[in-house]
Amino acid sequence: SMLELGVNRISINPQTMQDNILRRIGRGHSVRDVDELLQYVKNNTSLAVNMDFIAGLPNQTMSNMIENMDYVCQNLPENVTIHTLALKRGSPLYDLQMQDDIPEENLVAEMVQYGKARLEAAGYVPYYLYRQQYMRGQLENIGYTLPDKACEYNIQIMEERQSILSMGPGSSSKWMRAPEYRQLKQHMPKDVDVYHVTIDALLEKRHRICERFWEVV
């Protein structure tokens, strides 16, 4: 199991807690799915939990953000990240940016500020921040943590000091080596058929990279 392999935290990322919005953005999970998984993890494991929410989704209102923060404050996951919607070229939501159902920038800013106020009132503190291109209202993504529950991995990622091993089509792995923090990346093919045909060679290449960077035998 993950616990036996040393995993100590898990991300459960609802994005928002309204089924109509989840369907609108093409997510395959429901609010019930999120809650059942969270309760299972809390009741049966010692894993720390991170939850991600997005401000600025299609048809999203301030009432929706209030519902999201109500859920967080009732369940108190160790880490919470509030993202601002970033409409990237090529993403399924990109074509929606000219439609009226994307919230106005001032409303998105109010959602982000409300999330900050609710989380801090519940005992969370901000501990990392980053920005992306195309973010609504030139805002940012902010990670919050309960006291003594900060995820060091997130901090290291922001500082470009963290290796990442990813799996599956379209995934991207990154190797970092101290003290100079040189990095090397490997990108998996997005096409599933190409991925299946080339997976053995890609895994062999990954093993060689691991040996070179981490002196794995």
Spans of features found by a protein language model:
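A C-terminal junction/extension of Radical SAM enzymes
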Residues: 90-167
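Generic domain-boundary/flexible-linker signal
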Residues: 21, 62, 91, 138, ...
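Short, glycine-/Ser/Thr-/acidic-enriched flexible segments
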Residues: 56, 134, 170-173
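A broadly tuned preference for mixed-charge, low-complexity surface segments
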Residues: 4-5, 64-66, 131-140, 178-182, ...
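Radical SAM enzyme core and accessory elements
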Residues: 143-217
